[in-house]
Amino acid sequence: MECLLVIDSGYSHTTVTPLFNGRPLHRAIRRLDFGGKHLTNLLKEVISVRHFDLHQDTKIVNDIKEDVCFASMDFKGDLERSWKGSKSRQKDKAVKDKDKDMDMIDKLNDGEVRVDYILPDGVHLLRGFSRPHDATVTAAKKRKQTALSSASLHNSEISMTLGNERFSVPEILFSPSDIGSKQPGLPDMILQSLSVLPPLLQATMLSNVLVVGGNAKIPGLPQRVESELRSRIRTEWQVRVKTMENPITSTWLGGARMANKFPSVVREYGVTRAEYLEHGSAWTARRFLNGGSGKGP
């Protein structure tokens, strides 16, 4: 018995598809209408309000998302750590001098969340990059940028400090209600998908979960999915969530291997270019649902 639960989180949406003996169980497929573009757009709004207006710079924001965003394993804890720097700056200087050791610990903990991101200038730096947050350097640069004239500003390094933006943006995959959506989060959607299957299949599917798509590259996302599922299911069930080395191309590679190993299946389910141009994408969907070339629309 071959069971696989595929979570495909791509550009436009996220789908949960249980596979049994290589075939999708259509009645159990679920879709979450959030994908990579929604994360990028949300990050764009947050950065434009807090830092710089990047509404017209989708590519830059997408790079920022790929460079620094992560799925939090402890949302409340990370949220507190992201604010430690701003709180510590409000302390009296004498108290800071007295508690240098504690201040150092705060900085170390804070550095796990906050980073400084250097924006590209389009001339000398074509892609931005991140580095560990340094409050003293950041403050000095802000004073320098304020003193610079608009004519010479482009010659300076432009940076911004990112804190809770790093993990609050990917959080909408787990809590869509944060931005007003009534859809369930990814863990709940997975359980909804499995709820229509027999218990034996549910347990087997949970022990073989595969995350693919561009969002699978978000650090911590597979681990967060596994942690959320463990907290929601029977204690005797095993949960294993894995991802491919390159989750973006893994779907294509799987199709290529299937075409090479099972050419008869490709001939049965494949749609020619002429058929697609004549009937459109609906022909492809019905071909798969009806089980082959002899049972088209």
For the regions a language model picked out, list residue spans one by one.
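C-terminal region/appendage detector
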Residues: 1-297
